[in-house]
């Protein structure tokens, strides 16, 4: 599946992406990747997540914490463009939490991208079921 996604996106993985992806897929340990902006960290975590997430489960299984709204939206778009079939949602300030919750119930995202404050709001209000979360990307 990963090869199909890479072909679809027209991307060849660099060494950092390959190493990070293999570490996530084949160990039960936390993985830390430090790399400059634009080096492919988003794909380095989304490709393994596309293999690890249960597409048949309608509950959020991964939370991706982003520093700002733009990166939350961009990351959700990258996941969509991958064609993995996984559902995602970007959560960020500047719009009503209640509106996001309504969309969340409709979309039933398996991966939730969001800013720290907005994710905390949804967790505090019980809008985001944390009991199925298996992966956290910061």
Predicted regions and their residues:
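The conserved Walker
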Residues: 35-39
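Conserved nucleic-acid-binding Ia/Ib motif block in the N-terminal RecA-like helicase ATPase lobe
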Residues: 3-4, 57-124, 132-135
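Conserved phosphate-coordination/catalytic loops
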Residues: 11-15, 43-44, 95
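Conserved pre-motif I regulatory segment
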Residues: 1-34
């Amino acid at each position: 599946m990963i090869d199909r996604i890479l072909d679809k996106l027209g991307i060849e993985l660099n060494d950092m992406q390959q190493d990070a992806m293999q570490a996530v897929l084949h160990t039960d340990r936390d993985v830390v990747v430090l790399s400059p902006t634009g080096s492919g960290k988003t794909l380095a975590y989304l490709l393994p997540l596309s293999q690890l997430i249960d597409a048949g489960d309608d509950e959020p299984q991964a939370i991706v914490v982003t520093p700002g709204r733009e990166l939350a939206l961009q990351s959700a778009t990258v996941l969509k463009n991958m064609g993995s079939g996984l559902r995602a949602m970007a959560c960020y300030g500047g719009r009503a939490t209640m509106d996001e919750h309504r969309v969340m119930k409709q979309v039933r995202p398996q991966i939730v991208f969001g800013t720290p404050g907005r994710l905390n709001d949804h967790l505090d209000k019980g809008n985001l079921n944390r009991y199925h979360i298996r992966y956290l990307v910061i």
